[in-house]
Swiss-Prot record:
GO biological process, one term: axon development
Glycan-modified residues: N73, N177
GO CC field: membrane raft; myelin sheath; plasma membrane
Keywords tagged on the record: Cell membrane, Developmental protein, Differentiation, Glycoprotein, Membrane, Neurogenesis, Osteogenesis, Phosphoprotein, Protein transport, Transmembrane, Transmembrane helix, Transport
UniProt protein name: Neuronal membrane glycoprotein M6-b
Transmembrane regions listed in the UniProt entry: 31-51, 90-110, 136-156, 224-244
Taxon lineage: Eukaryota, Metazoa, Chordata, Craniata, Vertebrata
Length: 265
């Protein structure tokens, strides 16, 4: 029979080893989390959601403003209505694609991070795994360039609505309010190329333009386009983070897969 003091000491030692083992396991698991990819995933989800949701509603509001004020003849803006409807369907596709792609990128980030940090023993990777990582690097670069174009394109309606809003502010200003020159301050939507030059009326002036700026459709569409543009910018930043993370992981995997590799990053 062992003394009670020795038995208690052994039990305390076993408990401390178990706690230490649990702590080391938690640290090991946390070390395998791709924090850069995780931040990029949250940012990408938020950006795509803002762009798709706000952009869809803003496009519908833009069509309503054009039909009610700038182009009363349906045949004049028929092509624009079809293009906007097509863009709304494209938005559905973008949201679905990025929902899947970002999840796959996050899973790939967990795989490559675990392999790079050798969390499961010695370094293990296959040629197929490195090929898949390289494919994700290429796709992410292509999507990053494409979203730069989307970000620039989403700034166009913001610029257009800002010009209309600033013109309305000029009409409301005390310097021009009540003068005969107010009715000569106009906005010609045809100059932006979204409706043909023969569209009627195409140009709105004075108090009629001020009434348009006071409508809920204009207010909501203007601010939703701003939020959609910000969402596109957030998506670009997320893809840039993905580019850096995937490129670094692929480079390390490629380097460590060499037989003559003797240096570790």
């Amino acid at each position: 029979m062992k003394p009670a003091m020795e038995t208690a000491a052994e039990e305390n030692t076993e408990q401390s080893q178990k706690r230490k083992g649990c702590f080391e396991c938690c640290i090991k698991c946390l070390g395998g989390v791709p924090y850069a990819s995780l931040v990029a995933t949250i940012l990408c989800f938020s950006g795509v959601a803002l762009f798709c949701g706000c952009g869809h509603v803003a496009l519908a509001g833009t069509v309503a403003i054009l039909e009610q004020h700038f182009s009363t003849n349906a045949s004049d803006h028929a092509l624009l209505s079809e293009v906007i409807q097509l863009m709304q369907y494209v938005i559905y596709g973008i949201a679905s694609f990025f929902f899947l792609y970002v999840i796959i990128l996050l899973a790939e980030g967990f795989y490559t991070t675990s392999a790079v940090k050798e969390l499961h023993g010695e370094f293990k990777t296959t040629a197929c795994g490195r090929c898949i990582s390289g494919m994700f690097v290429f796709l992410t670069y292509v999507l990053g360039v494409a979203w730069l174009g989307v970000f620039g394109f989403s700034a166009v309606p913001v610029f257009m609505f800002y010009n209309i809003w600033s013109t309305c502010e000029v009409i409301k200003s005390p310097q021009t309010n009540g003068t005969t020159g107010v009715e000569q301050i106009c906005v010609d939507i045809r100059q932006y190329g979204i409706i043909p030059w023969n569209a009627f009326p195409g140009k709105i002036c004075g108090s009629a333009l001020e009434n348009i700026c006071n409508t809920n459709e204009f207010y909501m569409s203007y601010h939703l386009f701003i939020v959609a543009c910000a969402g596109a910018g957030a998506t670009v930043i997320a893809l840039l983070i993905y580019m850096m993370a995937t490129t670094y992981n692929y480079a390390v995997l490629k380097f460590k897969s060499r037989e003559d590799c003797c240096t570790k990053f």
